[in-house]
């Protein structure tokens, strides 16, 4: 004998079955960034909760200030996620030099951006290797290192890297200066076997400081 089920119970059962059939994606966010076409949060503004490959398609000629309200993001110098990379963590960036930090290079353009889905400041693990293709001396990192040489790495280059957990930003010089390279556990399978895979702007093996990206 079938036991009667009211409409509310039927909906609950259906929802539960659907959740089992279609599990939620691993990366749900939330992410939120607000960009402005003038410095100091003036001018035209637009909010985003997902990637933007070309800000010009939204009527902007450039991004000159921004606010990150949720999540961590990567900003790119050029459209289609190319050029120099800038890690954008929660906070306010009134001018281009706020996101380029102590970068030795004067770059005022920010034309595309996307969320960093794998950022996890608490659980982050990175293995660096002396040579490309994961060969040679290696070192496991689980913390922030303003100077790899002071940590005992011994030289100013890293040949290849494996991101086992989280997301990391590597810098060309000590003290988190110079070119930024964002490495993620959900890109390239977390494996970066050569500097050419660090980003379209990468030109050298030189990395001298590394830190975890905060979500």
UniProtKB/Swiss-Prot annotation:
PTMs per UniProt: The N-terminus is blocked.
Location of region: N-terminal arm: 1-30
Stretch list, region Connecting peptide: 118-123
Superkingdom: Eukaryota
InterPro entries documented for this protein: Beta/Gamma-Crystallin, Beta/gamma_crystallin, G_crystallin-like
One GO term of the biological process aspect: visual perception
Pfam families for this protein: Crystall
Domain Beta/gamma crystallin 'Greek key': 31-70, 71-117, 124-165, 166-214
PANTHER family for the chain: BETA-CRYSTALLIN A3, BETA/GAMMA CRYSTALLIN
Family the UniProt entry places it in: Belongs to the beta/gamma-crystallin family.
Comment field on protein domains: Has a two-domain beta-structure, folded into four very similar Greek key motifs.
Name this polypeptide is given: Beta-crystallin A3-1
């Amino acid at each position: 004998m079938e036991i009667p089920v009211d409409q509310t119970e039927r909906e609950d059962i259906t929802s539960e079955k659907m959740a089992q059939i279609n599990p939620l994606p691993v990366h749900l966010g939330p992410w939120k960034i607000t960009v402005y076409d003038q410095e100091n949060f003036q001018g035209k503004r637009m909010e985003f909760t997902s990637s933007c490959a070309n800000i010009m398609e939204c009527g902007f000629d450039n991004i000159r200030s921004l606010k990150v309200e949720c999540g961590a993001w990567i900003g790119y110098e050029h459209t289609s996620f190319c050029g120099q990379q800038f890690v954008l963590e929660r906070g306010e960036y009134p001018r281009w030099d706020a996101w380029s930090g102590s970068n030795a290079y004067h770059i005022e353009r920010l034309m595309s951006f996307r969320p960093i889905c794998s950022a996890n400041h608490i659980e982050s693990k990175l293995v660096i290797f002396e040579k490309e293709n994961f060969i040679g001396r290696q070192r496991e990192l689980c913390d922030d290192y303003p100077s790899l040489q002071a940590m005992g790495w011994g030289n100013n280059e890293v040949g290849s890297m494996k991101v086992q957990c989280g997301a990391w930003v590597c810098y060309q010089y000590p003290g988190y200066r110079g070119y930024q390279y964002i490495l993620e556990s959900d890109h390239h399978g977390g494996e970066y076997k050569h500097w050419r895979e660090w980003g379209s702007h990468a030109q050298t093996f030189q990395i001298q400081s590394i830190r975890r990206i905060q979500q």
